[in-house]
Amino acid sequence: MDQKYGEFVGVDNLHAAIIIEDSEENYIAETPEYLAPSAEIAGEAETNNTPTYYDNMPADNYITEGPTTLTITVSGIPADKAAKYLGKKYDAATGRVLDTGEPNPPYCAISFRFNRGKNGYRYYQYLKGTFSGGSEEAASKSNNIDIRTYQLTFTAVNTTHKW
């Protein structure tokens, strides 16, 4: 099979950067930083298809797209980095994320790549969005290892800056 048709067989290089400015004149983001080792990334765009009918048959179809929601599963994120991207407070002296119940996540950009086939890649860049969630759990140790991962939701929206 031609390499450009290869299946997705992996994901890596998950990076994030806080957006400094998103205006009609400028789009400026911090230097991207490695977010965490990625296990799975699944995305779905919110779409709406509206057909119009004339003379008793469909004549046209109008398609709109809303935000894209990505569910990102990683091995774990350092507490300071999780607080930074989830818009929570971080106490560097104790290493604790302080959850006040009022997150204020910054707009940020993310990028990653899917492995395609044996040695190809498909690169993704979402230029603006926010993280939410931070689903995490732990269980008591036992004679079996019970591995738990960390799950984030990234909701991508349009930039103000026109490309």
Please identify what each model-predicted range represents.
Residues F131-W163:
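Mixed-charge, glycine-accented linear interaction segment located at domain edges/termini
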Residues G101-G134:
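Short helix-loop boundary/capping segments
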Residues T50-P58, G87-V97, G134-A139:
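Short acidic (Asp/Glu) patches
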Residues E65-N104:
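Ordered, amphipathic secondary-structure segments that act as subunit-interaction surfaces
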Residues M57-K81, D146-T159:
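Oligomerization/assembly interface segments of phage tail-like spikes and tubes
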Residues P37-S38, A45-D55:
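N-terminal "mature-chain" segments and other terminal, solvent-exposed stretches
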Residues V74-P78, F114-K118, T130-G133, A156-T160:
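Beta-strand elements of well-folded, non-transmembrane domains
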